[in-house]
């Protein structure tokens, strides 16, 4: 993997450029795609692909992280006229974990209005969808999922496909609206994150992946924190969760959100815990509520809320091998046992939904009782919580709040499908968002692989988003190379699931790369791959010269034993044989008929007398 990485990763991919697809419905909607150019003379058209990297790979845009990214969704909000600016909650020292620190961290200087819904109005994408309104965000994600393909290029989705929620041949804004109205998909997009490029999470769309980042114990600059996010989205992360703890949380998050073109998620409980010096028993609803509003005003797009962990479920974990492995779950379990009462997240869930509704924040209902070992998979505690998450989903939907459900964890292959079936049944088809799952526990250092196996399977079965796992899982904090490895590993899993689901256009990139491989177009092979730099570097290790990029063999087989070169020879031989046989057949026909021109007049019809 790449070792020397610039502070902000802004360069475009090889043979690629950013293009923008204009919406036919909204004049102010232009959807970014990545166009990969292929070798001249190959008779191959350039390929447009889904792109998560934002403006950072656009050569025409100057990146200045002190100013943040363009606020692309502000015109859409202005036209809808159902939001209003208001005085923001003042930043407190404890927001940054600075109770005893006299030196504040650098704050993001560029200020903008803080927005909220007018007069308690529901301004969520679910509310619009249920009202039959197609928003700019819905049109945006439809174009994005199609990779620029338009309705005229493919048949329209059949109405019955929209009704039963299956995958259409082409995505339309109406299909997107229907999926959101049914709760099968969400567009996580806080109105206070106008820099975000809308994306959709749902099982009838591309499988998405999330990358987790967090502040280091020693941070050199805010640029370093922003670059963690930029690095993750460069390699394909569809969303990023900021799991920072300790000091500077508020300011770090502000820098990340202002510079992020993808949705940002958090676990608000982590910051709330910092405000009580890490003592779980001292947490209160008021502190947690204040933290939600703080993050909502900054623009966090989705909250992980561990509201499904209830007091009666805690004893169900006693006989587990690994107990409660969720950090948020263990915090709330400790609080519940100390106070011997239901979680304040469960008891105040209605109010949490009111806050989410005000800013269009999606709720990711956390699996605090997920299994942390394959021995604990699919147990009573896990499914008791899942049932509760289904009940909470209906509470959120009643307030037009978008919801997805978090899932395991550690699950052996033969138990994965049951997880998906239970989730669809108990949680009413809300999108599923899983961590892997890891399919075995014997491979520390390789858990990106053990989990990608489960991720590909559960993505095929219907999971909408996969949370990546890096090689450092269970061992330590991932560095940038680990993040890249984790993201690409999960892009492979997600793409494999898309192929198995029969997603429109999913196989086009595979086919283009396969043709390039068969034609020995080495640079096209590199440029079409998920990681062009590594593919090219591996080829350079044994065939480093520029002339080697033109040869019709690789170092694995050599010139005499290359199967594809032999296949070319076989194909040429067969074509010559067919051509020769055709000429012989024509000659025989000529000799038989004695004429160069063969009579092709239709035979006379027989007349039948009745």
UniProtKB/Swiss-Prot annotation:
GO BP of this protein: thiamine biosynthetic process; thiamine diphosphate biosynthetic process
Gene3D superfamilies: 6.10.250.620, Radical SAM ThiC family, central domain
The enzyme's E.C. designation: 4.1.99.17
Cofactor binding remark: Binds 1 [4Fe-4S] cluster per subunit. The cluster is coordinated with 3 cysteines and an exchangeable S-adenosyl-L-methionine.
A single GO cellular-component term on record: cytosol
Annotated residues for binding of Zn(2+): 410, 474
Pathway: Cofactor biosynthesis; thiamine diphosphate biosynthesis
Keyword field: 4Fe-4S, Iron, Iron-sulfur, Lyase, Metal-binding, S-adenosyl-L-methionine, Thiamine biosynthesis, Zinc
Subunit structure: Homodimer.
NCBIfam families given in the database record: PRK09284.1, PRK13352.1, thiC
Protein name in the entry: Phosphomethylpyrimidine synthase
Organism: Bartonella henselae (strain ATCC 49882 / DSM 28221 / CCUG 30454 / Houston 1) (Rochalimaea henselae)
Taxonomic placement: Bacteria, Pseudomonadati, Pseudomonadota, Alphaproteobacteria, Hyphomicrobiales
Gene field: thiC
